[in-house]
Amino acid sequence: MNYLAGVDEAGLGPILGPLVVGGVTMAGPEGTAPWRLLQSHVTKLKYKKGKVRVADSKKVKQGPHGFKRLEETALVFWTALHGEPPATLHEWLVALGHDLAPLQRCPWYENLDLELPRRADRDWICLTGELVARSLRQGGCELLDISVLAVDVEEWNVLIEDTDNKSKAHFHAYAEVLGHLLHGLFPRVGKDDACTLVADRCGGRMHYQMDLKRLCPDAFITVVEEIPGTSTYNLKQASRDITVTFAERAEDRAFPTALASCFAK
């Protein structure tokens, strides 16, 4: 079995907020390419009617119908994993494990009972989600986990106060999702399984070995390469190996990373 996971974030640009980190884990037979397996329902390079686009979220969200298409992508895959889309934003945040109290203290988040979807068609999402789930099953693949962490204003300000550094505060949030995926993968991965996690690179940061050691203190971590644009590490725990790569434009390299970017956006 091959395991493939991805992490990406949205919101940390010239104008911050809210910072959201997404993570996705999948499994399938060796050689499986998710974009090819799901080509009847999913497109990568451009939008096609009747399909959802899984790509860099900035590209998915382009144009006058961008929000609808982004919503379709996220809710279709949520439905593929959970059987149905969430009915409200409140329900979705609870399902993701969020503490709603800090959000409710922000006046711009006072209405968390917004119905979902906002612009997409719910029946179409339910149908397409089931078709995606069926295609995954027929290909021997499985969508294992979708994790989304939203860092509200209050939490971000605390992180900045604690670290006095925007980059460190950013990686602290990033590491929560990264660690969640890694801790979920280690018990699953067998000695004959391949496992790769591809994360979008955090700004100009090149070195992640010590950060990974803090996340996985029981793992032996070696540097495979640290070069401009890509940093790769091997994490070994007992007989289990996970390769973690931080790369520029990671959304173009790995399906789960592209899907994670859409959930974060």
Regions found by a protein language model. Give the residues of each.
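RNase H-like, Mg2+-dependent phosphodiesterase core
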Residues: 1-265
